[in-house]
Design a protein with these regions (language model features):
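A short, structure-level motif marking secondary-structure boundaries and short turns
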Residues: 10, 32, 50-53, 138
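Glycine-rich loop at the start of a catalytic domain that most often binds anionic cofactors/ligands
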Residues: 47-56, 71-75
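Glycine-rich beta-strand-to-loop/alpha-helix junction loops that act as flexible
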Residues: 37-42
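Glycine-rich helix-loop-beta junction characteristic of Rossmann-like nucleotide cofactor-binding loops
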Residues: 25-30
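Short active-site oxyanion
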Residues: 32-35, 54-59, 101
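Conserved phosphate- and dinucleotide-binding cores of soluble alpha/beta proteins
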Residues: 2-16, 65-228
């Protein structure tokens, strides 16, 4: 019984930190902005925080789940087609290293998330304190083409499929279980494999700000200047 109580408190603390980070990020959004909305449990707290501000926003969602949740709160969501740049994109993370490398994609939407992040003038990552790590660890999410899948898996090595999981765009979702102490090298390995649509390693230069909630406080790591 005591063990269960401690575990529940820990979960409550994590959820509180997700909310704190999300609310801090919502303050970065200006009225009239074109906003990229990520996917995941931390973004779930961002949506009501944005809705409560009552801003006039034009949003692009990275998954059907985020799009549906945003619309339910009265947030305008539009297709990404025809939108060349976003003012800001906000998303969660699975792991955040001290040097700014980030792992994303536990939910299988990392290809869309990476496209949206790259299109944003300012990409902001939000997370609870348990996502801050000393060294990145496997697994690293991958989206793969179904064509030539066995050859791709053989070239990648140490990669397992997530059963029948598919991305929002139909790609095969897999996880790389090899060492990732050198994220730049691992990223290059993925990029050199033709069957890899996208991977969950996000380099430091892609991110402008990281907001990590620690209790009621928010640690703000500035990684890069927002694009002009």
């Amino acid at each position: 019984m005591p063990i269960a109580r401690v575990r529940c408190l820990a979960v409550a603390d994590v959820e509180h930190e997700k909310r704190v980070a999300a609310e801090a990020a919502a303050a970065f959004v200006d009225d009239g902005s074109i906003v990229g909305l990520g996917t995941g449990s931390t973004v779930a707290y961002l949506l009501p925080a944005l809705a409560e501000r009552g801003l006039s926003l034009h949003c692009v969602a990275t998954s059907p789940r985020t799009e549906a949740a945003a619309r339910e709160l009265g947030i305008e969501v539009q297709p990404f087609q025809g939108v060349a740049r976003l003012d800001i994109a906000i998303d969660g993370a699975d792991q955040i290293a001290p040097d700014g490398w980030i792992v994303k994609g536990g939910g299988g939407a990392h290809t869309r998330e990476k496209i949206v992040a790259a299109a944003a003038d300012r990409f902001v990552v939000i997370a609870s304190s348990n996502k801050a790590v000393d060294v990145l660890k496997p697994p690293i999410p991958l989206e793969l083409l179904a064509f030539g899948l066995d050859a791709t898996l053989a070239e990648l090595g140490q990669t397992e499929l997530r059963d029948t999981a598919r991305s929002p765009d139909g790609g095969v979702i897999a996880d790389y279980h090899g060492a990732v102490e050198d994220p730049a090298g691992v990223s290059a390995h993925f990029d050199a494999c033709p069957g890899v649509i996208a991977h969950g390693l996000f380099p430091p230069e892609m991110t402008a700000d990281v907001l990590i909630a620690r209790g009621d406080e928010v640690e703000h790591r500035v990684l890069a200047r927002p694009s002009s």
